[in-house]
C-alpha cells in the first residue's frame, strides 16, 4: 500500500510539472486534471493506511 502512495505521489508531481509550468502548452488543462486525480488517489491511499486497511491491494 505504501508503494502505491509513492506511485501516486510521483504521478502527481509529474502532472504538476507538466500542468503548472506551461511545458505541455495546449494539454495544460488535461495535465492539471490528471494532477488533481492522482493527488486525490494519494490522499485516499494515505487515509486507508492510517485507518489500518492494509488489504486494499485488490
Curated annotation (Swiss-Prot):
It comes from the Bacteria. It comes from Vibrio parahaemolyticus serotype O3:K6 (strain RIMD 2210633). One of its GO terms (cellular component) is plasma membrane. Pfam families: DUF1328. The lineage of its organism: Bacteria, Pseudomonadati, Pseudomonadota, Gammaproteobacteria, Vibrionales. Its main location: membrane. It is a multi-pass membrane protein. The chain crosses the membrane at residues 4-24, 30-50. This is UPF0391 membrane protein VP0082. Belongs to the UPF0391 family. It is found in: Cell membrane. Keywords: Cell membrane, Membrane, Transmembrane, Transmembrane helix.
Amino acid at each position: 500500500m505504501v508503494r502505491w502512495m509513492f506511485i501516486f505521489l510521483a504521478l502527481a508531481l509529474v502532472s504538476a510539472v507538466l500542468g503548472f509550468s506551461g511545458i505541455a502548452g495546449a494539454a495544460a488543462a488535461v495535465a492539471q486534471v490528471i494532477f488533481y486525480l492522482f493527488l486525490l488517489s494519494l490522499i485516499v491511499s494515505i487515509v486507508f493506511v492510517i485507518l489500518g486497511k492494509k488489504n486494499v491491494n485488490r
